[in-house]
């Protein structure tokens, strides 16, 4: 399907140009480690973080009550918990003094203020829907928080993975989005420009600088030049192969669970038609894309939850690649060669995402669609998606741990800003099953309800599932200590270091 040579030729053509452009740039201080990003975070306020970069960097700046293990199960982080009744959970902050980076102690009052802020409709947090069943929060002691919920929910602790903010700063409407104050392993230093963000490791003072380099070829060239020390993901496989065979660079690969999909505006007269969405599903040769474009570094997906998830469904039947069936479905919806189904397809301006969009466009056009690709810078693109200004788009969900994502993305009332149901999907059976799953105390019944939700979603196609992408990390040979996570977070920065730096 694709030839790797054009990308490599592009690399060599750009090498001369880019080396000339950056030759005047000084190498970074050895005291700073630079991490190359495709896109910068939208916000550093954990109450609003829904994009990948924001979520991953917020994990470094803030502590949260709970985290998740490799089996997608909630485990204690800042606090351990007990279920006193099916509607009452008590959390104890773990031993030791917890302090925010401004020196203030972290107590149960801060936990209470954080979640009450998320629950406050005036905050307009997109995370509100996941904790909306909290009826009250009490703080019987400085290290104790009681959560009361209106219905039993055995997954409730896992929904509290939101970074904790200082209560006094919440009251003063502190701009956490640009000047975060947390208690995590890293503290905020500066955001001097839109393409540069610095944080500092609390334990040893190591500074990490995130540098936005949207073009993947330029990002690789900066890595080779030493202008950045490491990067993760958002590279075409040809560049990954190139780095793997380049001296002085270390490359790690890891299976991932980040879910890429096509999303639709279901109020649109074209893609709002089920037959059209099913035609799209049958027109896409996902197996060929994962084999040739990703070089096997992605797996086809049938649902937002991977089959390995405890609520995932490995028995979901995929939409086979069947161009003839796609044409027949289009005909049944009233489209033909004289009257093609016209779709505007929005994507980010990242070259690899544009390349994928072009391949999808070609496959759809072959069966009778007329697809117009519109690519935008990340801020404009993501703003359009959140605001519902789209007909069709492609995006990825990252860091999914709990099946509560099904409520966030598909429940009828989870339309932004109350959630992430951006396509305005409505299905009474899905709503009922999600409510039933949330209210049962039987984990087996809960898993069965969520699997049925996923079967309905695959049938109704508010999303067309595409694939789970693997993770790739590349660093200069003097960088060590970084371990990749299955969800692609940046927690490896907690231990990363330059091997010739003092103390290593």
PLM features per residue range, with description:
Residues 28, 92, 126-169:
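Surface-exposed binding/hinge segments that line
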Residues 272-362, 426, 432-433, 452, ...:
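Append "and occasionally in soluble cytosolic enzymes with long acidic Gly/Pro-rich linkers
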